[in-house]
Amino acid sequence: MKLLLLLCLGLTLASSHKEAGQDVVTSNFDASKIAGEWYSILLASDAKENIEENGSMRVFVEHIRVLDNSSLAFKFQRKVNGECTDFYAVCDKVGDGVYTVAYYGENKFRLLEVNYSDYVILHLVNVNGDKTFQLMEFYGRKPDVEPKLKDKFVEICQQYGIIKENIIDLTKIDRCFQLRGSGGVQESSAE
């Protein structure tokens, strides 16, 4: 009897571990499950000046919407001259989890890893004239995530040649939360 109980316990644990692993998706993405509210958590680039204060790629996601043609519509905030402003970008689907958008050059990004209820990791390549750089973004469903997920992002960035010093933890700065859910411009005093 004890052996049977131990066997059942072992199978239950193995089953729950397998189910937890299935939460992470790396292909065959369901865009409808990506839709909704998100928070920018971490930002990384091999050209750090693009993600530093006043950098063109220092943006904060608020919302992702899926359009009828499978494009993704993003609502972002960014700071311009110390003011938080909203802006929108529509990204055209070109493959499974692969999208393009014109923004400070031509951008192609790929969903690397998604846990629909917790986080999204994106890898973007920007080409602007003869200059090219990479950008990695980590979005969470909540304003912050567990340290182990941040560590995972650091490891993934390093696999793409982005050093730890080029990763910015956006949870430590003003992410223009005062504009979330509204539309417009608002002064921001913190950074």
From Swiss-Prot:
Tissue specificity: In the submaxillary salivary glands of mature male pigs, but absent from that of females. Expression was much lower in submaxillary glands of castrated male pigs than in sexually mature individuals.
Keyword set, alphabetical order: Disulfide bond, Glycoprotein, Secreted, Signal, Transport
Any one of the GO CC terms: extracellular space
PROSITE patterns with a match to the protein in the record: LIPOCALIN
Glycosylation sites noted in the Swiss-Prot or TrEMBL record: N69
Family matches, as InterPro entries: Calycin, Lipocalin, Lipocalin_CS, Lipocln_cytosolic_FA-bd_dom, Maj_urinary
Signal peptide location: 1-16
Gene3D superfamilies: 2.40.128.20
GO terms of molecular function: odorant binding; small molecule binding
Compartments in which it is found: Secreted
Cystines in this chain: C84-C176
Domain of life: Eukaryota
Protein task: Binds pheromones, the pheromones are released from the saliva of males and affect the sexual behavior of females.
PANTHER family associated with the record: LIPOCALIN, MAJOR URINARY PROTEIN 1-RELATED
Quaternary structure note: Homodimer.
Family: Belongs to the calycin superfamily. Lipocalin family.
Protein name: Salivary lipocalin
Native source species: Sus scrofa (Pig)
